[in-house]
Amino acid sequence: MDLEALKSIFEGFDLAAFLPELDSIVGWAEMLMRIFVMAGPLLLLGYGIMYLVSPPKEANYSLGYRFFWSMSSLHAWTFTHRLVGVVWTVLGLALTVVMAVYCNAFRRMEIMDAMNTAIGCIVWQLGLILAACLVCNIVIVICFDRHGFFRFGDEEE
């Protein structure tokens, strides 16, 4: 076997061409982290505005914020969607601003630090959303009985 012939075959071969561009992979990872971090607050803001502007008209099992007390009467249903609309809009707006600041900082971080920060942001978002839903449910239970009647007097729409 001729060694010179073998060298001539691999003369134009560049091993580095097979390796991915790490800058491109880091760029894709950063973009995906931004999407994952911003998706929750933007969806929360969108649903909050939708519940304020155009809530579902009747209690149903397919659309709307479903909770046993809120589905008992039309008054409880509209009250629930107004309350949830306000809470989700405010929380969505606040989280959008805060998460945009964090997403802006991803470029200055190392990739693993940015990933850990993104995971922390998503966990905080989920915790705040669950707390907001819990508070809304408690307010609904306090304001309405299980049959959908307002507990504090005779409030009309």
PLM features: residue spans?
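N-terminal signal-anchor transmembrane alpha helix
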Residues: 34-50
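Short membrane-interface loop/juxtamembrane segments of multi-pass integral membrane proteins
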Residues: 66-83, 156-157
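Juxtamembrane "helix exit" motif at the C-terminal ends of alpha-helical transmembrane segments
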Residues: 94-112
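Membrane-water interface of transmembrane alpha-helices
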Residues: 45-64, 135-146
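Alpha-helical transmembrane segments and their immediate juxtamembrane interface regions
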Residues: 111-156
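Select subsegments of transmembrane alpha-helices in polytopic membrane proteins
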Residues: 81-95
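Long, highly hydrophobic alpha-helical transmembrane signal-anchor segments
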Residues: 2-38, 111-122
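Alpha-helical transmembrane segments of integral membrane proteins, especially early/N-terminal helices
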Residues: 1-17, 45-56, 86
